[in-house]
Amino acid sequence: MMEFFPEIPKIQFEGKESTNPLAFKFYDPNEVIDGKPLKDHLKFSVAFWHTFVNEGRDPFGDPTAERPWNRFSDPMDKAFARVDALFEFCEKLNIEYFCFHDRDIAPEGKTLRETNKILDKVVERIKERMKDSNVKLLWGTANLFSHPRYMHGAATTCSADVFAYAAAQVKKALEITKELGGEGYVFWGGREGYETLLNTDLGLELENLARFLRMAVEYAKKIGFTGQFLIEPKPKEPTKHQYDFDVATAYAFLKNHGLDEYFKFNIEANHATLAGHTFQHELRMARILGKLGSIDANQGDLLLGWDTDQFPTNIYDTTLAMYEVIKAGGFTKGGLNFDAKVRRASYKVEDLFIGHIVGMDTFALGFKIAYKLVKDEVLDRFIEEKYRSFKEGIGKEIVEGKADFEKLEEYIIDKEDIELPSGKQEYLESLLNSYIVKTIAELR
């Protein structure tokens, strides 16, 4: 078997004092926290598209990436090489999961029938490699946005033929996701939206989107796919206005169409900020709705208005993200998928590894800090005290549905002063700083 990364050793944990860029400083996969190895808390995953398909191309320049599989000119040889490279990459980084779009792993043919046959050959290669590896599929999905046929959308297209093609493509993607033991299946509507309402039948598009998702649910039941269906919200890009704008919008859509019981959310950090939210906001919304399924781990540049998909390095963000995951009970059929790409000028193979290492370290550290915050209940206690008025007296009656406008008016009408608690935001931010510093100091 050809080795694709001979210059890269198996990445080891060396501790926080290490200056080796090809070593973990905070991520020890076998470190046991709360009775479970860290790797099982975090469930890291490699995104096939960014790691093995992205070439460093941008709207203003040609590809820059130096990749060992680029030596292959035949599309099938390159596809097989990428699969083999994936397993070597995961094993050297001690990552146990990967995710893919159908068109990432195999090239398209002239017809859908031909494309499916090509896809089957690559899936067989993946299955062969899985036999000798502990690498598993976290989730699969279909690329319903790159091909020109999807210029008007897939489930929300104006063409019944395109709708049929998209349905057949998702049918096949569900089949191979099941065949490979995927824990979930993601729906991301990059072209499900509009550029202008001047040419859009908004009602029909939304109804057709619901019909499409319902068909997917029904087919999954038919073939016995028990993985978790996930919606990945994003407000814009490539489409000006996308229907799965954020968690709240997508949940309202699912609820309105009686689909909410079948779906959870795959939350991406950079999508949250594009929607004008923090990463934690989207995770909190999903958590309180009981719909936090999985995470696409990355970060954006707040000075730029597009999806930069950078590797996560912000300890505050990862701490607050893992706080929400822990409070939700941890991942079940989900994990932390690095939907992140190295910068265009970081074109060496080594940079691929370094990007994943820093992302894994940052989330590992964030988890350790968040675990202490949850265990010590410092935020819980403050919030409970802040809202204490709803635990007793008239507040308790409000919560229990025993108060109405007349009763509340009678209660408040002669009160002269209302004393409010301080929000203490500065204190809590200081407390978060202290937990970060203290946790790092205690690490070996």
From Swiss-Prot:
Subunit structure: Homotetramer.
Biological process per Gene Ontology, one example term: D-xylose metabolic process
Keywords, comma-separated and alphabetical: Carbohydrate metabolism, Cytoplasm, Isomerase, Magnesium, Metal-binding, Xylose metabolism
Binding site for Mg(2+) 1: 232, 268, 296, 339
Cofactors (names): Mg(2+)
Catalytic-site annotation from UniProt: 101, 104
Main subcellular location: cytoplasm
Highest taxon above the source species: Bacteria
Residues holding Mg(2+) 2: 268, 271, 307, 309
Gene: xylA
Protein name, as recorded: Xylose isomerase
Family note: Belongs to the xylose isomerase family.
Organism (species): Thermotoga petrophila (strain ATCC BAA-488 / DSM 13995 / JCM 10881 / RKU-1)
Disulfide bonds: none
